[in-house]
Each structure stands twice: as C-alpha cells, then as structure tokens.
C-alpha cells in the first residue's frame, strides 16, 4: 500500500498543516505487526485517505464518541460537538457507510486538533 506524504497534509482551504509524523509512522509499524486495535486501524484508514467511501457510518460515530464528542441526533443528522473544538461535525448515512466528504471533514479535524493522540 502506497502511503501519502506524512510530513504535510492539505486541508480544504489549501493551507498546509503539519501533522504528527511520529504518530503516523508508529501506526504503520503497528499495522505491519498486526497488533493495532479497532480504533487505531480506523484512524489509520481515515488519515491515509484512500478508502473514504468504505468507512462504516457506525464505526465513524463510535470513533468520534471515543474521542470525546457528544452526539445529538435530529432526524437523519448525527451532530457531534466537543468542548474546545469550534467546528461541529454533521454526519449522515449513505447506505451503511459514511459519506466520503464527511470522512474528509473528520480527517481534517483529527489533524487540526491532533485528536489522534487520544487513542
């Protein structure tokens, strides 16, 4: 599997964000040894950005809850908020999967607020 450049990530505004190179490569080493937990694998998949359309909706919701977000449901909209984070995350199902653009929004938040260190 080809990995993206671990030094820089680009958010939707085109600004470069440095993210934790050590954490990313630690995940790569754990994956090679096959000793990653469920949420570490999910974060690895989200950060690589190669399977945004294959992330299960329920797995993404559970990951956000594990990261400390509070969920509020209004119809088909699942809204996640966390103290200290300005943005709110709004997720909807696309069948049994999360919508790819919403997975990208979650990835940008994980990188921006360094939430990957919480797992």
List each model region and its residues.
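Basic nucleic-acid-binding interfaces
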Residues: 3-6, 12-74, 83-119
């Amino acid at each position: 599997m080809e990995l993206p450049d671990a030094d820089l990530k680009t958010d939707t505004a085109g600004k470069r964000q440095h993210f934790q190179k050590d954490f990313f490569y630690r995940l790569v080493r754990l994956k090679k040894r096959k000793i990653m937990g469920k949420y570490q694998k999910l974060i690895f998949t989200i950060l690589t950005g190669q399977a945004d359309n294959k992330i299960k909706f329920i797995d993404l919701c559970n990951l956000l809850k594990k990261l400390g977000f509070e969920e509020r449901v209004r119809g088909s909209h699942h809204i996640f908020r966390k103290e200290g984070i300005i943005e709110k995350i709004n997720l909807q199902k696309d069948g049994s999967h999360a919508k790819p653009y919403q997975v990208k929004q979650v990835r940008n938040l994980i990188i921006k607020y360094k939430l990957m260190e919480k797992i």
